[in-house]
Amino acid sequence: MSDLGDGATRLLARLEASAILLVEWETSLQIRLGYPLAPNGSRFFLVPDAQLRKVQDIAAELGFSPAHEDVLRSVYPCELSGLAVRYLIDDTTYDQGPPRRRLVFLPMSWTGITSDEVVPILVDDGLQPALPPSAWTVPLPAACAAFARIAAREKRTSPVRNGVIEQLSSVIGYSLFDMSYEGDYMEDLPNDQPLSEDEKLEIERAVKEIKSWKLRKDEEWIKDILVDIYTGKKTFSDLPCAKGPTL
C-alpha cells in the first residue's frame, strides 16, 4: 500500500492491530467482482457499527480530521448516504480533474450486510488498489443483494439509488456475461433484433447462476426481479423504491 503515504498506512495498520473488521466496498469490491474500473487510489471500507467510533478515535489520535463537504466533495454512492466518515489521503488542494483520493469508512448496517456474509481475501491477487492483509470482501450474491436493498430503500430519483443500480448492473454484467463484445441483452431485450444462440446461452447460464444464490428468505424477491430483468420482462428501473419525491 505504498501509494497511500505514511499517514493513511499507519492508520490502517492501527485499525488492523485493534481488530477492526475492514470490509472492502465501492471501487475495490467492484474491481474484485470483475468490473474493470480504473481506481484512483481511494479506499472504502464497511465497518461494524459498534466499531465505527473506535475507527474515528484512532484516526483522531493519529492527527486525522474528518473531511467535510466543503473540503472533499461527495462523489461515490456510499458518501451520498450521509453516514460515511471520510478522510483525505493527500494534502492536495486542487478541485479540478479526478476526485481527490479519500479513505472512507461506512457502517455495515447501511448495506444490510452482516459479518457472517463476508469472506477473507485469501490470496494476494494483485488487484488495485492494494488493501490491508486482513481486509475482508463481499461475495457476488451478498453484494448484489446489498445493492438491491439500498436501491429499494431510496426514492426513485435519488442519486444513491441511481449509483447503486449502476453498480448492480455492472458487477452482474462483468461477472456473469462476456463483456468483450456489446451484447444487447444487458437490460432491455430488443424488439426488432433476435438474440444470437450464444447470447441466449449466456443469459440461460446467468439466470441459472442467479437462481442458485442463497439469499435471506425475505429477499428472494431480489433473485426474482434480477431473473425478470435478464429475461427481458423488467428493467432495473422496476426495482422497488421508497415513495415520494426526493428533496
Task: Describe the role of every protein-language-model region.
Residues 13, 57, 61, 224, ...:
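Charged/polar, solvent-exposed surface patches and flexible loops
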Residues 4-57, 235, 240, 246-247:
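Active-site nucleotide-donor binding segment shared across nucleotidyl transfer reactions
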Residues 2-8, 47-89:
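Metal-dependent nucleotidyltransferase catalytic core
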Residues 37, 60-61, 118-120:
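Surface-exposed beta-strand edges and their flanking turn/coil or helix-capping segments
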Residues 18-21, 41-43, 62, 83-85, ...:
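Generic structural motif recognizing short loop/turn segments at the entrances and edges of beta-strands
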Residues 82-247:
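Catalytic cores of NTP-dependent nucleotidyl/adenyl transfer enzymes across multiple folds
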